[in-house]
C-alpha cells in the first residue's frame, strides 16, 4: 500500500509542479485531507501521509499546464490506486462554492411535496392484476412521515389487492437513506423485524443500523405474493441498496440490467482554496445481508434475470405469469403422480417433497423443468419420471385421460384371407437362413400383436420355425426392430424354455391405471416345437432396438436364455404416458410418468434405460462378433468343468471343494456363464463365484495368452552369487540400524528360499546379524515384505528361541499328499541366537503377505513377539497355478494350509491381526514407545510398591504387597501401553490385598482435571451454592410427623461450616420439629469424613462430647478421634427421638462410616440392605513420570473395642429388606411400633 501511495502522490505532486507554478504542493495535502476526512473506505488510505512526504521530497517534475488535463490525470491516478471509479476530480474555476446539494424536501410546502411525489411516483394495475409502482427518487423519513397517509390512501391502497407487484427502479438515480426501511418494511412480514443493512458515514465516523419497522401505516404486501424489481444501468445509490437488500432477502426477483454501482451518498467538495473539486462517496453499506463480503457499490447489483432495460417490464410480466401458474402445475403434478405413477410406495415421499420445494428462484420454464426434475429424481430415484419442455414448434399429442396403456393390444388388424398373400406377408417380415456351422439366423424387424401371430402361426411355423429346428445354435437379429405391442413377448419367450416340466415364471407387471398385478408364465402348449436354450441363442441389438424388442432382449438376458451382442438399446419402453402440466404461448410442459412396473424373474424392477449387451460392439459388427462368441461358447463347458476338477485336485481346503464344484456345475447348467463372451469375462465371473462360495480371496482364475510355468515343476537350484555380488545384494536387501536405547532394527522386503539362505548364511551373519544380536530389543520390519518362500521360516524363528527344548512353530496341511507336517525350530543355527527373553517387535502392513505373515503369526501365536501395524489380507504358504486344459485360462489356488501350533486351527485365510493396530506409518514409533514403556516397568513397580507400603491403611499388608509386587515383573513383559499396564497393576494389587478399593488407573493428560485428590474442586459462589443445596438435599414431612432427609454425597467439613446457616435455613428447619427421623442413605456414595461429626452432633444431646470413632491414618501413622461438637448452628434433634437410617448395596464410604457409628452407638435403627463394604475416602498418588495413578485407602476405622469394622464387609442392618421396600418398612415401624412394641434392650431406646 505504501508503494502505491508513493507512486500516486509522485504523480499528483509532479502534476502540480509545472513551470507556471500555478499549483502549489499544498494542494496535494488538501486533496489528501478531503479523502481522509470524507472517503467512506478509510482503511484503504493507510500510509498516505508518509507517501505524501516522500512525494514532496522527490522533486520530480511533470509539465502539465492545462488544469482540465491535470484534473483528468489526477482522477485516473486516484481511481487506479483506490480501485474506485466514483472518485472524480474536476476543475471548475467559475464555481465560487461547492455545487449545492439537493434542497431539503422538508422545506417544501405540502402542495410542492405533493407535486414532487407525483413526478417521482407512478402506479397502476396492469393486466393480470399485477401492481406497478415506479419510483424515480426515494423520499426520506421526513417526507414519508408527512405524506404517509396520502401515499397509503392514494398509492399503496390501490396496489394492495394485486396478485403480484413490479417495483420499477430503472429511472431511480438517488434518494434518501432514511427511506430504505419504509420500502423494505412494506414488503416484509410484520411478525418479525429484520436487520437489513448497516450504513457507515465517514464525515461523522458513525454507523447506523437499518431495521425493518415493527409497525407501518396501512397494510403490508402479502409475503406469499411475488415482487419483481426492475433495474437499469442508470439505477444508482439508494435504489441500488433497496434492490440489493430485496434480492438478498429472497423477497424479490431483480430483472433488467446491472445497476450503475454508485454510492449511497456522493458529495462534491472543494480542495483547499483552489478551483479543484473532489467528488467522494462519504457513506457505504456494510451489510449484514450478503455476509458483508458482497457489495454493490462500485460494481452494481447483478440482476437475477438479465435483459435490456426497455424490455425489463415485458420480461417481468412473463415471469409473473409463469410463477402465477406454479401452484396449478404442482397440484397437477401431484394428482398425476397419485393417479398414474406405478411405484406406489414412492408416491407419499414424492408428494411431500413437492409440497416442501422452494420455487422462489424459478424465473423461466427452464428453471422450472430443472427444479422439478431435480426434486423428482431425488425423491424417486426413477430416471423415467421426467418433466420436459415442449417448444412452440412442436405439436404435442396428449392421450385422453382415460386412455388405455400405450402397450395394450388394440384391435387386431384384419388379415387377408388369401393364403398366398399371408405367405408373402410372413416372408416380408421374417428373414431366415442357415449360416456355416449349422447356425440358424432369424431376423424380424417388428413385433406383431399376439392375435396376429395366432392367425399367422401355421405360416410362421412352416416358413420360419421349421427350417431352424435342426440348427445347433440360433442368432436372432433385432438390430432393426423398433418393437411394437408387448402382448406377444410371453409367447415368443416360451419357445426358448428349457426342459422344465411346468410353466416358467417369465416376468411380472403392475399396471397403476388398472391397479392389477399380473404374473406372466411360459405357455405350456405351443404350436410347434421349442428351441431349447441348451443349443445357444444369440440376440443382436442396436440403438434402434426399442419397445417390445427391448423387453424381449432384456428378458432373454435376465432369464439366462440368450447372449446379447451389439449396441445398447434405445431405452424407449411403452410403459409410460405423457401428461400436460402447463400450456403457454412460448410452449408447454409435460410429465412423462411410468404407469407400468416391469419386474423380472429375479424380483428386480426395470426402471427403463437401454439394455446393455454382454458384448458391446457396433451394430454392423454384431453378427461377426456373435459368431466369435458362439465359437468361444463351444469350449465353455470344458473350461468350467476343468476349473472345478483343478479345485478338487489341488485346493488346500477340501471341506469347501464340494460346494464350489457344485456351484460351478449348477451355474453352467442354468446358462449363467453365457454372459461371458471371452476368456477375460469368463475368468472374472469364475473368480467372483469361487470367492463368494468359498470366502477365500486367494482363489483366482485369470487369462494369460502367453505361456506360464504351471503346476509344481521343481525350481532350478539357486545360483550362489560371487562374494562381491553377495555383499551388494545384502546391502541392497537388508537395512539394519541400532536405534537409541540399544534397540535393533532389521528390515528385509522378501523371504528367500531356505537353500539360498543356507548358502549365504555366513555372510548374512557377518554383515547383518552381528550388528543386531547384542541389542537389548529388536524390531523386525516386514511392512514392505510381500512374502515369497516359506521354507526359511523355521530357520528365522529358531534365532529367537533356545536350542533346547525345540519349539513347535506351526503345522502345514499339504493338499497334494493330504498329510499334516509339523514345523519345529532347528537345533543348530549359524552364529549366535538372539535368545528367548529379549523383546521382539514385528511391524506389519496390509501389503505384508504369505511367508511374512507366517513368521509374524507364529511369533505372535507363541507369545514371542509383539505385532504392530495393520491387519494383513491373508496370504498362502504355497500357491499353485494350473492351466485349465490346454486353454490360456489359469487357476491360482492355495495348495497348503497353515495351522496354529497352539489351537490347531487354520489362520492363513484370515491373515494376521496385530496386537496393536495402527497405520503402518506409525508402527515404528509405536514400537519405540513400547520399548521405552517396558524399560520403565521395573521402576514403576518399585514406585507403586513403595507408595502402597507407605500409605496403605494396613501397614503390615502394605509391606507384604510391596515385596510380592516386585516378584511379579514377568507378568508385565508383554505390556504394550500404559492403559494395559494400569489394568495389570490394578489386578495384581487387588489380588495381593484382597481389597477392591486399591486401584490403578491411566488418566490422560487432558483428563487430569478430574483426578480426585490431585486438583482441588472449585468452590462455587454463595449464590450458586444456595441453589446447589436446594437441589442436592431432599426433605419431606411424612404422615404422623415423621421427618425425611435424603442426600447422596457427603461434603467437606470446612465447606459445610461455611454454609451451615444456609443448610439450617433451607434444609434443617423443615424437618427439625418432627417426632421421628428417617435418613435415607440408599443412594449415598460417600465423600469426606470431616463432615461426620457435624451431622452426628445434631442427633445427640448438648453436654459432654460423645466419641464417635477412631480413624487410623497410615501416611502420618497416627490415630485421630471423631467427637460430637459442643456447639452447632441451629437446634439439635437430640437423642430421645426415634431415628432410622435406610441403606442399600450402593451405600458406600463415608455414608457407611456414618451408619456404622450411629448403629454401634445405638442411636439409630438401620433398615435395608448390607452396604457395599467400601473404605474410608482413599487418596490418589501419581506414579513417576507416567500417566498412572494409584488410588489407595490410607485410613481405617479402629474405634470398635472388638476390632470389628465395616470396611470391606459393609454394615449389616438391624432389619434386612430389599432397598426398594426399606422406606415403607421404616414408616410402618415408626408409626405403629415406636411406642407400643417392646423391643430388646438394645433397640428399646431408639424406638
UniProtKB/Swiss-Prot annotation:
Q: Which residues are glycosylated?
A: 205, 515
Family classification: Belongs to the peptidase S41A family.
User: Quick one: where's region 4 X approximate tandem repeats?
Assistant: 18-1230
* Function in brief: IRBP shuttles 11-cis and all trans retinoids between the retinol isomerase in the pigment epithelium and the visual pigments in the photoreceptor cells of the retina.
Q: Which UniProt keywords apply?
A: Disease variant, Extracellular matrix, Glycoprotein, Repeat, Retinitis pigmentosa, Secreted, Signal, Transport, Vitamin A
What Gene Ontology terms describe where this protein resides (cellular component)? cone matrix sheath; extracellular region; extracellular space; extracellular vesicle
- Alphabetical list of CDD domains matching this protein: Peptidase_S41_IRBP
Cite the residue spans of the region called Disordered: 391-413
Tell me the protein's name.
Retinol-binding protein 3
Q: Could you tell me the superkingdom of the organism this chain comes from?
A: Eukaryota
User: What does the UniProt entry say about where the protein is found?
Assistant: Secreted, Extracellular space, Extracellular matrix, Interphotoreceptor matrix
What are the GO BP annotations of this UniProt entry? lipid metabolic process; proteolysis; retinoid metabolic process; visual perception
State the InterPro entries in the record.
ClpP/crotonase-like_dom_sf (IPR029045), Tail-specific_protease (IPR005151)
Effect noted on mutating residue 530 to H: In a colorectal cancer sample; somatic mutation
Amino acid at each position: 500500500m505504501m508503494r502505491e501511495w508513493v507512486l500516486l502522490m509522485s504523480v499528483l505532486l509532479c502534476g502540480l509542479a509545472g513551470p507556471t507554478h500555478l499549483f502549489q504542493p499544498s494542494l496535494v495535502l488538501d486533496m489528501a485531507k478531503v479523502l481522509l476526512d470524507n472517503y467512506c473506505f478509510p482503511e484503504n488510505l493507510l500510509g498516505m501521509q508518509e507517501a505524501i512526504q516522500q512525494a514532496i521530497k522527490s522533486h520530480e517534475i511533470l509539465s502539465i499546464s492545462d488544469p482540465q488535463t491535470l484534473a483528468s490525470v489526477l482522477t485516473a491516478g486516484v481511481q487506479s490506486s483506490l480501485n474506485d471509479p466514483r472518485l472524480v476530480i474536476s476543475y471548475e474555476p467559475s464555481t465560487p462554492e461547492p455545487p449545492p446539494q439537493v434542497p431539503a424536501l422538508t422545506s417544501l410546502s405540502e402542495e410542492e411535496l405533493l407535486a414532487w411525489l407525483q413526478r417521482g411516483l407512478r402506479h397502476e394495475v396492469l393486466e393480470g392484476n399485477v401492481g406497478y409502482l415506479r419510483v424515480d427518487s426515494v423520499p426520506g423519513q421526513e417526507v414519508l412521515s408527512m405524506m404517509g397517509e396520502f401515499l397509503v390512501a392514494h398509492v399503496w391502497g390501490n396496489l394492495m389487492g394485486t396478485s403480484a407487484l413490479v417495483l420499477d427502479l430503472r429511472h431511480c438515480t438517488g434518494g434518501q437513506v432514511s427511506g430504505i426501511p419504509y420500502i423494505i418494511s412494506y414488503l416484509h412480514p410484520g411478525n418479525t423485524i429484520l436487520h437489513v443493512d448497516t450504513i457507515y458515514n465517514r464525515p461523522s465516523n458513525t454507523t447506523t443500523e437499518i431495521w425493518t419497522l415493527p409497525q407501518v401505516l396501512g397494510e403490508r404486501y402479502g409475503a406469499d405474493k411475488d415482487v419483481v424489481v426492475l433495474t437499469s444501468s442508470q439505477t444508482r445509490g439508494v435504489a441500488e441498496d433497496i434492490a440489493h437488500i430485496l434480492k438478498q432477502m429472497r423477497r424479490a426477483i431483480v430483472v433488467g440490467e446491472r445497476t450503475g454501482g454508485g454510492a449511497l451518498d456522493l458529495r462534491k467538495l472543494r480542495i483547499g482554496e483552489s478551483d479543484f473539486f473532489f467528488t467522494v462517496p462519504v457513506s457505504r453499506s456494510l451489510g449484514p445481508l450478503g455476509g458483508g463480503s458482497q457489495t454493490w457499490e462500485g460494481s452494481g447489483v447483478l440482476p437475477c434475470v438479465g435483459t435490456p432495460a426497455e424490455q425489463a417490464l415485458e420480461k417481468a410480466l412473463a415471469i409473473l405469469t409463469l410463477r402465477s401458474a406454479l401452484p396449478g402445475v404442482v397440484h397437477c403434478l401431484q394428482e398425476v403422480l397419485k393417479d398414474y405413477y406405478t411405484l406406489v410406495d414412492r408416491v407419499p415421499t414424492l408428494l411431500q417433497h413437492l409440497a416442501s420445494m422452494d420455487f422462489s428462484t424459478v424465473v423461466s420454464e427452464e428453471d422450472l423443468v430443472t427444479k422439478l426434475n431435480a426434486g423428482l429424481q431425488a425423491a424417486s430415484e426413477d430416471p423415467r419420471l421426467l418433466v420436459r419442455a415442449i417448444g412452440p414448434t412442436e405439436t404435442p399429442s396428449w392421450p385422453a385421460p382415460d386412455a388405455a396403456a400405450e402397450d395394450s393390444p388394440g384391435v387386431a388388424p384384419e388379415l387377408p384371407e388369401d393364403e398366398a398373400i399371408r405367405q408373402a406377408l410372413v416372408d416380408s417380415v421374417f428373414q431366415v437362413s442357415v449360416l456355416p456351422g449349422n447356425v440358424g439366423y432369424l431376423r424380424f424387424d417388428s413385433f406383431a400383436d399376439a392375435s396376429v401371430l395366432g392367425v399367422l402361426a401355421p405360416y410362421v411355423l412352416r416358413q420360419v420355425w421349421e427350417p431352424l429346428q435342426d440348427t445347433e445354435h440360433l442368432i436372432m437379429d433385432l438390430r432393426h426392430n423398433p418393437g411394437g405391442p408387448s402382448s406377444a413377448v410371453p409367447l415368443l419367450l416360451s419357445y426358448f424354455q428349457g426342459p422344465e416340466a411346468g410353466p416358467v415364471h417369465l416376468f411380472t407387471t403392475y399396471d397403476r391405471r388398472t391397479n392389477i398385478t399380473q404374473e406372466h408364465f411360459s405357455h405350456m402348449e405351443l404350436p410347434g416345437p421349442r428351441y431349447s436354450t441348451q443349443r445357444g441363442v444369440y440376440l443382436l441389438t442396436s440403438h434402434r432396438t426399442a419397445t417390445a424388442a427391448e423387453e424381449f432382449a432384456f428378458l432373454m438376458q435376465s432369464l439366462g436364455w440368450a447372449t446379447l451382442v451389439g449396441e445398447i438399446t434405445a431405452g424407449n419402453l411403452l410403459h409410460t404416458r405423457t401428461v400436460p402440466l402447463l400450456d403457454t404461448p412460448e410452449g408447454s410442459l409435460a410429465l412423462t410418468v411410468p404407469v407400468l412396473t416391469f419386474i423380472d424373474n429375479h424380483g428386480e424392477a426395470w426402471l427403463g434405460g437401454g439394455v446393455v449387451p454382454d458384448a458391446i460392439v457396433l451394430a454392423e459388427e454384431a453378427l461377426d462378433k456373435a459368431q466369435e462368441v458362439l465359437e468361444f461358447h463351444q469350449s465353455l463347458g470344458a473350461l468350467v468343468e476343468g476349473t472345478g476338477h483343478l479345485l478338487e485336485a489341488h485346493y488346500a481346503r477340501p471341506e469347501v471343494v464340494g460346494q464350489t464344484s457344485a456351484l460351478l456345475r449348477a451355474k453352467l447348467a442354468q446358462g449363467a456363464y453365457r454372459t461371458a463372451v471371452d476368456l477375460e469375462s469368463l475368468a472374472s465371473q469364475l473368480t467372483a463365484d469361487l470367492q463368494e462360495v468359498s470366502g477365500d480371496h486367494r482363489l483366482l482364475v485369470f487369462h494369460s495368452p502367453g505361456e506360464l510355468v504351471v503346476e509344481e515343476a521343481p525350481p532350478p537350484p539357486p545360483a550362489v552369487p560371487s562374494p562381491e555380488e553377495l555383499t551388494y545384494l545384502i546391502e541392497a536387501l537388508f537395512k539394519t540400524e541400532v536405534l537409541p536405547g540399544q534397540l535393533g532394527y532389521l528390515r528385509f522386503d522378501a523371504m528367500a528360499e531356505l537353500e539360498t539362505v543356507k548358502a549365504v548364511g555366513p555372510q548374512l551373519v557377518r554383515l547383518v546379524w552381528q550388528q543386531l544380536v547384542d541389542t537389548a530389543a529388536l524390531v523386525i520390519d516386514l511392512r514392505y515384505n510381500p512374502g515369497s518362500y516359506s521354507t526359511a521360516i523355521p530357520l528365522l524363528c529358531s534365532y529367537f528361541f533356545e536350542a533346547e527344548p525345540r519349539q513347535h512353530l506351526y503345522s502345514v496341511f499339504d493338499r497334494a499328499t493330504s498329510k499334516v507336517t509339523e514345523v519345529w525350530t532347528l537345533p543348530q543355527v549359524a552364529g549366535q541366537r538372539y535368545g528367548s527373553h529379549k523383546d521382539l517387535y514385528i511391524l506389519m502392513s496390509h501389503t505384508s503377505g504369505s511367508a511374512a505373515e507366517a513368521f509374524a503369526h507364529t511369533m505372535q501365536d507363541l507369545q514371542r513377539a509383539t505385532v504392530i501395524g495393520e491387519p494383513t489380507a491373508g496370504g498362502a504358504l504355497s500357491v499353485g497355478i494350473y492351466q485349465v486344459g490346454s486353454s490360456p485360462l489359469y487357476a491360482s489356488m492355495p495348495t497348503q494350509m497353515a495351522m496354529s501350533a497352539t489351537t490347531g486351527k487354520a489362520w492363513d485365510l484370515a491373515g494376521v491381526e496385530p496386537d496393536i493396530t495402527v497405520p503402518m506409518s506409525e508402527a515404528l514409533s509405536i514400537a519405540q514407545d513400547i520399548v521405552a514403556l517396558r524399560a520403565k516397568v521395573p521402576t514403576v513397580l518399585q514406585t507403586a510398591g513403595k507408595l502402597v507400603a507407605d500409605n496403605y491403611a494396613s501397614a503390615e499388608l502394605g509391606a507384604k504387597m510391596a515385596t510380592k509386587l516386585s516378584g511379579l515383573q514377568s507378568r508385565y513383559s508383554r505390556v504394550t501401553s500404559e492403559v494395559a499396564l494400569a489394568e495389570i497393576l490394578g489386578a495384581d494389587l487387588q489380588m495381593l490385598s484382597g481389597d477392591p478399593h486399591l486401584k490403578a488407573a491411566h488418566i490422560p493428560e487432558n483428563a487430569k482435571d478430574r483426578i480426585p485428590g490431585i486438583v482441588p474442586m472449585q468452590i462455587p459462589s454463595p449464590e450458586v451454592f444456595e441453589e446447589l443445596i436446594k437441589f442436592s438435599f431432599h426433605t419431606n414431612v411424612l404422615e404422623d410427623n415423621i421427618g425425611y432427609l435424603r442426600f447422596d454425597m457427603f461434603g467437606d467439613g470446612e465447606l459445610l461450616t461455611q454454609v451451615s446457616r444456609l443448610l439450617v435455613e433451607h434444609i434443617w428447619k423443615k424437618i427439625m420439629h418432627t417426632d421421628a427421623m428417617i435418613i435415607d442413605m440408599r443412594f449415598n456414595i460417600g465423600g469426606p469424613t470431616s463432615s461426620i461429626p457435624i451431622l452426628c452432633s445434631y442427633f445427640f444431646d448438648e453436654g459432654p462430647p460423645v466419641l464417635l470413632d477412631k480413624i487410623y491414618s497410615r501416611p502420618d501413622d497416627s490415630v485421630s478421634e471423631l467427637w460430637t461438637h459442643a456447639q452447632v448452628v441451629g437446634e439439635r434433634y437430640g437423642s430421645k427421638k426415634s431415628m432410622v437410617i435406610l441403606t442399600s448395596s450402593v451405600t458406600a464410604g463415608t455414608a457407611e462410616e456414618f451408619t456404622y457409628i450411629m448403629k454401634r452407638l445405638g442411636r439409630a435403627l438401620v433398615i435395608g440392605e448390607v452396604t457395599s463394604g467400601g473404605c474410608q475416602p482413599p487418596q490418589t498418588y501419581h506414579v513417576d513420570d507416567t500417566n498412572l495413578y494409584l488410588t489407595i485407602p490410607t485410613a481405617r476405622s479402629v474405634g470398635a473395642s472388638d476390632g470389628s469394622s465395616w470396611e470391606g464387609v459393609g454394615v449389616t442392618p438391624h432389619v434386612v429388606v430389599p432397598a426398594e421396600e426399606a422406606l415403607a418398612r421404616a414408616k410402618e415401624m415408626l408409626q405403629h411400633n415406636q411406642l407400643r412394641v417392646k423391643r430388646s434392650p438394645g433397640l428399646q431406646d431408639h424406638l
